[in-house]
Curated annotation (Swiss-Prot):
Origin species: Acorus calamus
Entry's Gene Ontology molecular function annotations: structural constituent of ribosome
Gene giving rise to this polypeptide: rpl33
Chief localization: plastid
HAMAP family in the record: Ribosomal_bL33
NCBIfam families: PRK00504.1, PRK00595.1, rpmG_bact
Coiled-coil zones: none
Name used for this protein in its record: Large ribosomal subunit protein bL33c
Length: 66
């Protein structure tokens, strides 16, 4: 039997340095990753260090609203 709400949510992680600097002419876009998090274990916003292909380095990617 299924319990009301699922524990796992699909979340989108977005590069914080691309967003902070804005999308300039050198950067063609903003890096985004799609992943899952467990709502019971991680109730706060998720932040992970991932590789940004527009900044060419590892940066902090934070969870955004859909």
């Amino acid at each position: 039997m299924a319990k009301g709400k699922d524990a796992r949510l699909t979340v989108i992680l977005e590069c914080t340095s691309c967003v902070r600097n804005g999308v300039n002419k050198e950067s063609p876009g903003i890096s985004r990753y799609i992943t899952q998090k467990n709502r019971h274990n991680t109730s706060s916003r998720l932040e992970l260090r991932k590789y940004c292909r527009y900044c060419y380095k590892h940066t902090i990617h934070g969870e955004i609203k859909k």
